[in-house]
């Protein structure tokens, strides 16, 4: 609908150029067509006249009047009026919204999908948890946001690759191996001789038990078997990493999160990518040596201080493999790279970008893009839940899914802006009431399915083609309000892709569900008149389709019964 109005406005601008109101060489401005904050100001508004006023040497309201007069007639527009300093407000006809219902029915699963990405490549990295323990609720928020963002970008026409980066080469992996070894040797976290920075959760005992039993882990087709030798630290390291990666994959599968690429930090060293990145930086002239260390002149690229790349002992600082990793993304042809991280990692953003810019490879400023999420507080019975016995120090994603459901966890972890603190209320997530937003939205979908079953049980034939032809019968307040909400869906999907904010889909679905429940309570659907009944069922089915499409973008199921 917005595209149709933009086309009308464009034709009006051409008419003003043709009649001399605008100079012939006036370029069409980048005007907006948007929904006003209040319905009293119409269904859509544009600022086109305000942007063109200078070129026309006219005040904006006078030019708005001229543009209004030059607009072609449209069956979708009931009236047009000027407001404020020169906004043009459009009031649409009921037929415009009724036709949108037909678009939903005909396009089905594809309704709301766009072409903004035009098949261009984007890599979306998310979760990227260290393989040192179970996924916690923070990883869950990263998974929910990142996976939904990938779905939204796909719906906007981007060629999306989903990527998980494993930090499998750092000190934490050494601490993991030592912890499992200690358990395998019969020690407990309270024993003398327990590693100073060891992991204390019960899961360490599970890993040690599996290792000593000679279990085999199938990690994406690669088999890793415990050698049963508690003295073989390298074998313990390999087995523990494989075991915990497999556990994380199990949790992610239960959470409906998939990846196309699993990238290992260790491969950067094995394949020489870290050395390659360092040599490119040295060759660019943006490094220097001081105190036996190699430094990057990162202050030349917006950092608050220069950064050590290679310490005097010859080892690299942690941000160097991060730069090398993102260099591989550029080399793999990603036009855009988006990384979803916890807000506690914000300090690394400037350093990684500085390292990439310093290579002088033509990498755009602001590449990669980042989406940062804040912490999650878990509540039960009005009190904060802080610990999991299995993990030892945090609430795991598996705990939340088992206590509520994958649907509820995904919804609640997505439904607020990523940069806002989030409270996950277990009691609310389990509630089967309208106060629970995921229940409220899913129930709207299930309610349509129930109505269709009732029609079938009563022997009432539903003719969808007839229903689409009879939509003009539905011109009451609640029907039109529901149609208006349906017409917003494609705009919300596009906006969520532009802003990298899938939470907007969740907000929209609540509003759509509210419009549907209001319509349902004020409109008997299975009436005796076949034409009216078919029209109402068609509106209900269109709502069902949009709810299903939107829930799919969030990775939440659309149940037929509740």
Curated annotation (Swiss-Prot):
Which terms does the UniProt entry file under GO BP? arginyl-tRNA aminoacylation
Location of motif 'HIGH' region in this chain is 129-139
Q: Which reaction does it catalyse?
A: tRNA(Arg) + L-arginine + ATP = L-arginyl-tRNA(Arg) + AMP + diphosphate
| InterPro entries in the cross-refs | aa-tRNA-synth_I_CS, Arg-tRNA-ligase, Arg-tRNA-synth_N, Arg-tRNA-synth_N_sf, ArgRS_core, DALR_anticod-bd, Rossmann-like_a/b/a_fold, tRNAsynth_Ia_anticodon-bd
Report the superkingdom from the record.
Answer: Bacteria
Q: Which GO terms describe its cellular component?
A: cytoplasm
Q: Name one GO molecular function term.
A: ATP binding
User: One short Pfam family name for this protein?
Assistant: DALR_1
- What PROSITE patterns would the database entry show? AA_TRNA_LIGASE_I
The leader peptide range reads: none
Q: Does the keyword Disulfide bond apply?
A: no
* The UniProt record lists the keyword Aminoacyl-tRNA synthetase: yes
Q: What is its EC number?
A: 6.1.1.19
Where does the protein end up? Cytoplasm
Predominant localisation class:
cytoplasm
Keywords per UniProt: Aminoacyl-tRNA synthetase, ATP-binding, Cytoplasm, Ligase, Nucleotide-binding, Protein biosynthesis
PANTHER family (alphabetical) = ARGININE--TRNA LIGASE, CYTOPLASMIC, ARGINYL-TRNA SYNTHETASE
Similarity annotation: Belongs to the class-I aminoacyl-tRNA synthetase family.
Checking HAMAP family in the record gives: Arg_tRNA_synth
Q: How does it assemble?
A: Monomer.
Q: What is this protein called?
A: Arginine--tRNA ligase
Q: Which organism is it from?
A: Xanthomonas campestris pv. campestris (strain ATCC 33913 / DSM 3586 / NCPPB 528 / LMG 568 / P 25)
What would be the name of the gene that encodes this protein?
A: argS
